[in-house]
């Protein structure tokens, strides 16, 4: 793969033109070595048992180096193919039969966004596109030519900027493969909360539970997908992938970066984090897969810090009074979770199944037919799940509103969408019969009854915590809309819970603890390196001294 030095490669670090593919690959292999520190490189050599960097490895060996236990064949295949593509950077269009340990190290550099941008020397480089290409390219063996294909030399910046002339509009990722990738990201989210946390997780144990949450993200990418079986006959385009990453799941790829960075730590430098231990307590709604899904949207220090159970309807009863008694003493942000079964036919349900629903229909204004555009994934009697971040303490507001600009509605099932506050004053808790509202003005309450006034993007919960309605009809309210078609969904509430999050001080402290763990591991790496004293044999094994190599920076 061109790991050996070439006399034709310019010694200047600013070289941009190369006479052959071999020279180009060799130069970027060496540059990758300079973007990992000396302790990291020594640790990596220890993890691969001192094997030469140009030695080849197979799928099982890659899983061992990544410390992934019980990965299924699909996961092994997609990770191996991803590394196989990135190992040949910047000539990612041309993939080779063998993956080497140098290729794994180069992949580690490329999948770390900060290192990658430094590696390519372009702050505007589209890292998300690179990840997509690594998942999408069909791998083929190609003989390396010693000369460029034209009379011109190889222009490295052009090769990088054009992704080696890969046409992303022609690429697709099978939806089945993307589902496995999304499931892996969710499965590893809690275990990779820092780069050197111990991966003490059997990823096959709860795979199906995480896959259910991953399917919601997949449906957002491709709305033609309803079930996991539909993934067998659909694909995901780059545009679909990019749109979801940018607007719905900004943190989705973080576990991939952390997973790859584990190769730079020896076992003795890995730590057991409190966040990686089983959740205590859990509930019907708060599970590890759900928190992993939330972590694709919100910072992981918010999601994986010690959540406090405040109110669970199944335990305390479905009433505003119970909610108030349990949740109102919490003087910090909280997450409201609401799950229910969508009501597909209002009149039939009110007449034949639940006559109390007729009262809710009378109080809640009907959406115009021309504004109702229901996606297939949201049609019928489906489970709906919403998580709402309330950044201020709960309080009774029978006339006013509370809630700041950080209020966010996240739909988690059957698709994932994010609706952020556009202005403060977006929540009410009305004990006079108005119920709970997110994104709406106060309901009109008279002796004759209640009239809800739903905002353009809003979640309305009736005062008995029995029925709810989610509306998404565009701009104009206190919550901004998503890119999904306008629609409204009423549902029977089956579970409602409120969980307390740490305040800014607590979250900052949690983040500092995790940062300290990473810094401490790096400090131990440096101490361990110094302890070898003048053992040049180890350093030569790592390729840091001798053989005219300068090594990485400490």
Swiss-Prot record:
SMART domains: TLDc
Keywords attached to this entry: Cytoplasm
Pfam families from the UniProt entry: TLD (PF07534)
The keyword Cytoplasm is assigned to this record: yes
Transmembrane segments: none
Domain TLDc residues, every copy: 284-502
Compartments it resides in: Cytoplasm
PROSITE patterns documented for this protein: TLDC
GO cellular component, one term: cytoplasm
Predominant location category: cytoplasm
Family designation: Belongs to the RTC5 family.
Role of this protein: May be involved in a process influencing telomere capping.
The protein's name in its UniProt record: Restriction of telomere capping protein 5
Organism in which the protein naturally occurs: Lachancea thermotolerans (strain ATCC 56472 / CBS 6340 / NRRL Y-8284) (Yeast)
Lineage: Eukaryota, Fungi, Dikarya, Ascomycota, Saccharomycotina
Gene: RTC5
